[in-house]
């Protein structure tokens, strides 16, 4: 049986985590071809999903050390240090895994630099698929890494058509390898199970929030929440009944909380 490995080391429960889980479930359950889907658990970041993976016959590849609970999760610098620790502890285990198991496909969601570098160095007998989420900043290092690895990547997927167009215009990847694939954020079966409320009751609940502005997303620099908070603080000077509700998590959470306290 051919195998598909998922690589998505995560620190917080952001949208990419849900997308990774639902994508793995879909491939395991609905694929026309018989594939064994496995998720790489680098340091214990996927431990809490073990029952879900077992339910859908998704395998878990365990690396030796479990240190996820000790890693700092919030703050830009702290989260970068945590990712660096994961890279250092995963370099040789991931190399050995790819060399020994030779999966048919290797899908990368987060912390993609490590598998990309390994593939550039050793050219494994595996089709590497790069999943690009959000609108990543194309700094010099990232652009160089992507450009140099383009020939070694099997496919590159983008969650939005805007991102796909932007990357095509940058001439970083082979255009024939790129395509649009939406994030698997919603598991339809779970969604149906959770909708147990009466339609009228639901509408009443929504109407009670008509003074709210809602912002949902990962709390990162790319989303520019400081600008939203600053502008809204000016807006409520004349509209005091209005409330901004931000739902999300990420490395900028602490900084945003400090800014909100300052503006209040």
Located regions from the model:
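N-terminal strand-loop element at the rim of the active site
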Residues: 6-14, 18, 26-81, 168-171, ...
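Donor nucleotide-sugar binding/catalytic pocket of nucleotide-sugar-dependent glycosyltransferases
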Residues: 61, 151-196
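Short His-centered aromatic/hydrophobic patch
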Residues: 86-90, 107-114, 132
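A short helix/loop element that forms part of the nucleotide-sugar donor recognition site in Leloir-type
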Residues: 190-207, 212
């Amino acid at each position: 049986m051919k195998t598909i490995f998922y690589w998505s080391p995560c620190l917080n429960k952001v949208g990419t985590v849900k997308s990774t889980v639902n994508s793995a479930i879909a491939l395991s359950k609905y694929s026309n071809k018989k594939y064994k889907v496995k998720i790489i658990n680098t340091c214990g970041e996927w431990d809490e999903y073990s029952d879900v993976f077992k339910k859908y016959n998704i395998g878990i590849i365990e690396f030796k050390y479990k240190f996820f609970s000790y890693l700092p999760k919030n703050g830009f610098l702290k989260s970068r240090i945590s990712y660096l620790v994961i890279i250092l502890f995963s370099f040789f285990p991931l190399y050995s895994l790819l060399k020994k198991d030779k999966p048919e496909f290797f899908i990368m969601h987060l912390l993609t630099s490590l598998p990309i570098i390994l593939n550039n160095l050793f050219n494994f007998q595996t089709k590497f698929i790069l999943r690009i989420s959000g609108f990543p900043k194309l700094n010099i290092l990232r652009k160089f890494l992507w450009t140099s690895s383009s020939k070694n990547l099997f496919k590159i997927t983008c969650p939005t058509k805007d991102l796909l167009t932007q990357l095509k215009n940058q001439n970083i990847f082979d255009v024939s390898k790129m395509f649009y694939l939406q994030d698997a954020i919603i598991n339809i079966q779970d969604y149906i199970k959770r909708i147990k409320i009466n339609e009228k009751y639901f509408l009443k609940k929504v109407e009670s929030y008509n003074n709210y502005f809602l912002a949902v997303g990962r709390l990162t620099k790319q989303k520019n929440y400081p600008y939203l908070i600053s502008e809204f603080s000016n807006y409520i000077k004349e509209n005091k009944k209005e409330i901004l509700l931000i739902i999300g998590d990420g490395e900028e959470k602490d900084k945003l909380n400090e800014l909100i306290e300052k503006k209040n």
